[in-house]
Amino acid sequence: DRVRVEYFNAKGNINSFLRKQSACNIIFRTAIVKAHHIRFNENLNTYVDWSFVLEYMKYVNKFVRIFNFPFYFRGEVYDPFETLTLSEQNFDILFKDYVNSFYDAIKRATNPKVREFIVTKMGNKIANEFEPTRYDINERYQTHKDTLVELSKFLHVHLVKNQKLINKIETILLMNNETDKAFKVNQFRKTLRHVKNIVLRRKNKERSLYDLTDKEDNVKPKTIVFESFGGKNYSDSPKYIYEYMQKYYPNYRYIWSFKNPDKNVVPGSAEKVKRNSAEYYQAYSEASHWVSNARTPLYLNKKENQTYIQTWHGTPLKRLANDMKVVRMPGTTTPKYKRNFNRETSRWDYLISPNRYSTEIFRSAFWMDEERILEIGYPRNDVLVNRANDQEYLNEIRTHLNLPSDKKVIMYAPTWRDDEFVSKGKYLFELKIDLDNLYKELGDDYVILLRMHYLISNALDLSGYENFAIDVSNYNDVSELFLISDCLITDYSSVMFDYGILKRPQFFFAYDIDKYDKGLRGFYMNYMEDLPGPIYTEPYGLAKELKNLDKVQQQYQEKIDAFYDRFCSVDNGKASQYIGDLIHKDIKEQ
């Protein structure tokens, strides 16, 4: 946009002059500033600008504002727990400073309209910061109740005149120093809002019912709720834990959460619930144990008498959460992402780790103390240990996928790119592997399975390669795909660690290695030295090497073995049993 300069009447355009509580983008005459010794109030820390602007307003009738001009760039905060911008400090510090700024501004304001504007701003600040649905509202109210009493007395005329009846009652109680009753009214406002959602049958009525009725007494000890990849499918470690428990503890109540329950078949007696339905919220309210392999929504209230088992979904190669320097994802910032992730991991009672390498990373990336980490291997990998040589089982998988029995199977499973997003939670992926060249080189003897990351939203166009390339992105069990694959091609995906259990050839197609290592996530390990197979940045050399699997196996055997020892040796085929028995024991002790 073009730089735009506009002139305003200082007395008539109060909102334009003061609305952002900032002196930025306003041109001040230095002669006036010097003549009247106008300065920022050094007793304020964050909300200092009004102290300068209001003094300046006393001596001018007009002012100039510049739009669309980048006066400065503010660097991004990478660790919101150690380094904060002024606006991201602890709420208690910020609110105290805002209140001090308000009183300072009131003293400086001589124009009645300016005073009214400042008072309105303070009223809006209270309404926003002490909104009854805030997760820490109880702590906020108790910490600042004396300040709220003082402000209510000062602002009562404005507040009572502009508030709804229920808000007026809260204000009057604060004015009379009855803070406990005022807080009850504050929470009653939330209750009324939920009741209104339910009565009017609004879209979020199920969530409102959950918020109103969820309590510790709801928890039923023999109820376990499972979810995989945010309800996408019946898969991964939660699947294998469930199947073990269904077999050995059939009398428990099992619930699976799905986005589309009708599209997922779950063996046994499990109930299926639709995500965000009334049954979904009831399941999470009643279950004594939650089992998930990815983050669950923060609006689900994990109570003290509930146990949350986080299986996670891979050995980390790319930096995670707290270890990421910069977060480039839609709908969030680095500080916001890390704070929300921290809130999530604080709810985990147990986190499954597949190896010592991962345990050390999880402690840092997820703010986890080691007592909560179970270093037992991934339940989803039990099948890789127990059935790798079960030929009848392998034939069943191949038959299900209609794979020719006389051809070798290549699996291509790339990861997603943080910066290639279309919207929050949805990412694009451009196939760079050159299917045409692979088909020409390998089509007679191989088929290739294409497995995109679960966050990838765009469908693959495989027109012309129907008998060679097969999209298995929606195949629920990736472990079964590993079992029938003669080799794996990946880039920075954690599938390399799971596939390493089989000690088969792996190829690494890292066409954007420089960007991914330095510009996006960064790696925990030495990518160029520690991998159990060759690395390619262009597709043609890759196609030639795929013809010689035995040669690659022999050439990299030492690295394959070292990779197995470091990352795969904990997997012993009994992780599902460990977690299933742990849950059973926990239930028995309740």
Where are these regions (language model features)?
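Conserved nucleotide-sugar donor-binding catalytic segment
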Residues: 8-89
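C-terminal subregions of glycosyltransferases and related glycan-biosynthesis enzymes
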Residues: 68-203, 247, 569
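N-terminal pre-catalytic "stem/leader" segment of glycosyltransferase-like enzymes
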Residues: 166-281
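Conserved catalytic-core segment of nucleotide-activated headgroup transferases in glycan assembly
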Residues: 233-246, 364-365, 379-462, 536-538, ...
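Donor nucleotide-activated moiety binding/catalytic core segment of transferases
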Residues: 273-289, 295, 449, 454-497
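A donor-sugar binding/catalytic signature common to diverse glycosyltransferases
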Residues: 290-319, 475-520
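A nucleotide-sugar donor-handling region in carbohydrate enzymes
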Residues: 318-421
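Catalytic binding pocket for nucleotide-activated donors in carbohydrate/polymer assembly enzymes
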Residues: 463-467, 494-567
